[in-house]
Amino acid sequence: MIKSAMAEKLWSKLEKTLVNNGKAFISVTGGGGKTTFLVSFSSYLKSLGYSVLITTSTKLASPFSFDYKVDGIFLSPSIINYWPGKGESVFYGSYNEALGKTTAPPSSMVSLLYDRYDVVIVEADGSRMLPLKIHTQRDPVIWKTTTAIVAVSGLWAYGKPIKQSVFGPEEKSGLVDKSYYEYLIGEPEGMAKGMSPHTDNVFLFNGGDVVEERVRKEMKTLSLPYSSFGFIVSMNKDEIYETL
């Protein structure tokens, strides 16, 4: 049984970890909860009075078909005429009618907008709703303005077939276990891709509330690169179960 009353609050911890002097430009990669991260973390930051810009360097579901819980939506360069207030969130992208999705706006425009928003959160990767991701040469798309990278993965893949759990060019077979997560962390096209010693790096293993305690304890012993943080969490419950 999970003693959630004892668990540390996730969004509070991430605000302290990722936001420095009131500013952060966060790129989110991987699978298993990126969109939940966008919505939940931006909502938490709003509650603290931060102005937040949500965007993508790849593709995102249209804000007209998915509720990002924002106060404003801009799908054109007219956003340059808008100045956000404190505690306000705005969605920005370019709409692709053929795809029915929001695609990446010019990175130069987003860099300019960073001057007027406290926090920018960028969905920098796609995983087609699968919990794990192997990248290609094309992704993730990390813009130069990035100050922090959050690599998300879903723990509900544990014990499931690799072929059914991973989006991307994966040739391995078998079941997902701790050694496979270790492989994903160390693989050049894996979880750590895009991270550097110059960014604040966080690994979020989401779904800590849906796996057994023995799995959480086993995953807690994973080794992470750089001076990064790692947390076994439940985004839906705003809880941290283990710190790596």
Language model: regions and residue ranges:
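Walker A (P-loop) phosphate-binding motif
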Residues: A7-L48
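Solvent-exposed alpha-helices and their adjacent loops that cap or buttress functional pockets
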Residues: T17-N21, N81-G85, L112-Y114, P140-K144, ...
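Short, basic, glycine/proline-bearing loop/turn elements
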Residues: A24-V28, G87-G100, A124, V176
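Loop/turn-to-beta-strand initiation segments
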Residues: K86-V90, R116-V120, A148
